[in-house]
Amino acid sequence: MRPWLLLLVGLSSFFALSTSVNRAKNSGSDFDLESRASTTNVHSILSKRKLRAFGGDTNTLKDSGKARREEKVWKLFCSVFLQLDDKKKCMFETNQVSSHQPEPRPALSFMPGPKPAHSLVPESKPVRSLMTGNAPVRSIATELKLVLPRITETVKNPSKSQVVMLWLHKVADFSKSEHGVNTMAYRTLYEWLSPSFSDAKLAKFFVGLREDEALRETAEKMLAYMLIKSTSTEAVGRAWLKSGEHPSRLFESMNFKEADFKDTVFLGWLKYAS
């Protein structure tokens, strides 16, 4: 074969190969454009495909193995062909797992030291009634199981019973409230304790309660009422002397009237003042 003929055949083959490569590139570009355009409708395509193959007509879904294979193929199509970053977008709704994570429980904090005062009192109806000033003092004591031995220990050493002292604070609040004006809670307390304690012991106890600012007024009223009810003023007089209370302050707390000036209580105060 002549050289020029071989050259012609070679050039023809080269041009034919170049043309086929260009056509392949052009067709690939068109295909890429179509695939990118189809991503805008991917959710509708997925829904139709899913509904037709898995969820739309249960009568057409006979073979579970085929369904699993279809699902794997479809996920592969989503992840490779459409090149989605989040493969969960291609998961079927029937197989989706909720990504919601429950909020962690708050850590329990165990604080060292004594509990707050309110935790010493059980949450019961009488206690809540006392908080609002509606319950008798005796019913609260019964609910809190403030039996006489416990009260006895408190009278001997008030610092050892936080519950009883808290209850006494409620007695003071109750006596100052609108509901406690007529019930005179401090009188009830004295009448409850007087059968078990001597006047000297109660006088010392009430004088000691005056050191608590919240119980000062109630303690003074209890002392005054005790002096009125007591058969002897000596115990109260000794308690007054020990406390060093000024006579004018005692006179105000006793709330004497003109008719009381001839009473033994007034005479006892006069003896103390002199």
Curated annotation (Swiss-Prot):
- Position of motif RxLR-dEER? 49-72
Q: What is known of its domains?
A: The RxLR-dEER motif acts to carry the protein into the host cell cytoplasm through binding to cell surface phosphatidylinositol-3-phosphate.
The main place the protein resides is secreted
Any idea what job this protein has? Secreted effector that completely suppresses the host cell death induced by cell death-inducing proteins.
The family line of this record is: Belongs to the RxLR effector family.
Where on the tree of life does the source sit, at the highest rank? Eukaryota
What is the protein's name according to its record? Secreted RxLR effector protein 144
Q: Which GO terms describe its cellular component?
A: extracellular region; host cell cytoplasm; host cell nucleus
Q: Where is the signal peptide?
A: 1-20
**UniProt subcellular location:** Secreted; Host nucleus; Host cytoplasm
Supply the alphabetized keyword list.
Host cytoplasm, Host nucleus, Secreted, Signal, Virulence
